[in-house]
Curated annotation (Swiss-Prot):
Descriptive protein name: DNA replication and repair protein RecF
GO MF term (any one): single-stranded DNA binding
Keywords linked to the UniProt accession: ATP-binding, Cytoplasm, DNA damage, DNA repair, DNA replication, DNA-binding, Nucleotide-binding, SOS response
Localisation: Cytoplasm
Biological process, per Gene Ontology: DNA replication; DNA synthesis involved in DNA repair; double-strand break repair; SOS response
Length: 367
């Protein structure tokens, strides 16, 4: 799948614009602060109804404007098109529309427009808190396991009930036991989905990483959030007093993590910033391969500031891997010359110059 048309209104400093991107490679170039990243942010809003630059959406809305809007026409893998739109008002009203109908949740957008982001903050996947890695893991599971979302919602409901009981003691013994059973059942299913996903991801990740950088001894493992040799109901029973003291459940899928190690050390403690970025790129490209294997569509990759912390050899290797995915890519850079010639002759490449929020297409992929 790919964006055939993208219309952006009142996002950051961007002037209202409608773009016709290439189904493959799109390079946005211009000076720092010109608005290149805001274009990627607009696509991110369209696919996830949130920004990757700010947890608050008010700063995304252009100064003196009350609403920002992003519209996209998506070419579907199975043929045909679908129209997606998101708008956000300063007062907080968020509207999501799919083919003219109001959508129930952002998950519907995410399912139709799977996005992968690679930017200067990508190293946080290794250095950041376990929550960041759980989000990465569950993005992948969501896109390859149709049962994941419903099970995840069951898990969250059971976890909220148990945590409320731990803090306030509002459940009788029978209700508490019932919610504990539901929590354990949903947790076992989530754990199974995650384990199966990591089993499929690891060989693809290792193969992809080997094409980017040599890191002998790097391992990827999955921690499910509780002792692998014990059932969750047993762990919950033995940790009940501590859970009550803490006011929340200490064990379960909500504590899961991905662990990347180099020998006996955490990879983030050993690798340079450039090496960390290559590891993250390999992880995200591997995810794209799995999505294409399970679904008929491809991810769309948003790559912000590609040259950052990568030398020419590694930039070219990354571009080659993205090209081999046969997916749509949006890349930002200051100077496009080193990127423009790095693709196969038959690969459609479109160039967009961004200057003070104005976007001009300087090379059409159809030329």
């Amino acid at each position: 799948m790919s964006l055939r048309r993208l219309s952006v209104t009142a996002v950051r400093n961007l002037h209202p614009v409608t773009l016709s991107p290439s189904p493959r490679i799109n390079i946005l170039y211009g000076a720092n602060g010109s608005g290149k990243t805001s274009v990627l942010e607009a696509v991110h809003l369209l696919g996830l109804a949130r920004s990757f630059r700010s947890t608050r959406l008010n700063p995304v809305i252009q100064y003196e404007q009350q609403t920002c809007t992003v519209f996209g026409q998506v070419e579907l893998a199975e043929g045909g098109t679908s129209n997606l739109g998101v708008s956000r008002e300063r007062q907080g009203e968020f509207t999501i529309r799919i083919d003219g109908q109001n959508a129930r949740s952002a998950a519907q957008l995410a399912e139709m427009l799977p996005l992968q982001l690679i930017n200067p903050d990508s190293f946080r996947l290794l250095e950041g808190a376990p929550k960041v890695r759980r989000q990465f893991l569950d993005w992948g599971v969501f896109h390859v396991e149709p049962r994941f979302m419903a099970t995840w919602q069951r898990l969250q409901k059971a976890l909220r009930q148990r945590n409320s009981w731990l803090r306030h003691g509002t459940l009788d013994a029978v209700s508490q036991a019932a919610w504990d059973r539901e929590l354990c059942l949903a947790s076992a299913e989530i754990d199974e989905y995650r384990r199966n996903y990591i089993k499929a991801l690891k060989p693809v990740f290792e193969r992809t990483l080997s094409e980017l950088v040599e890191l002998d001894g790097l391992t990827l493992s999955y921690y499910r959030g509780w002792d692998k040799d014990r059932e969750l109901n047993e762990v919950l029973a033995t940790s009940l007093l501590r859970d009550q003291q803490m006011g929340h459940t200490q064990a379960g899928p909500q504590r899961a993590d991905l662990r990347l190690r180099l020998g006996a050390n955490n990879a983030a403690d050993i690798l340079s910033r450039g090496q960390q970025k290559l590891v993250v790129c390999a992880l995200r490209i591997a995810q794209g391969h799995l999505v294409s294997q399970v679904r008929r569509g491809q991810c769309i990759y948003l790559v912000d500031d590609l040259p950052s912390e990568l030398d020419e050899q590694h930039r070219r290797a990354l571009c080659r891997l993205l090209e081999e995915l046969n997916c749509q890519v949006f890349i930002t850079c200051v100077d496009h010359e080193f990127l423009r010639e790095g693709w196969q002759t038959e690969t459609p490449v479109a160039l967009f110059h961004v200057e003070q929020g104005r976007i001009t297409q300087t090379h059409d992929h159809r030329e």
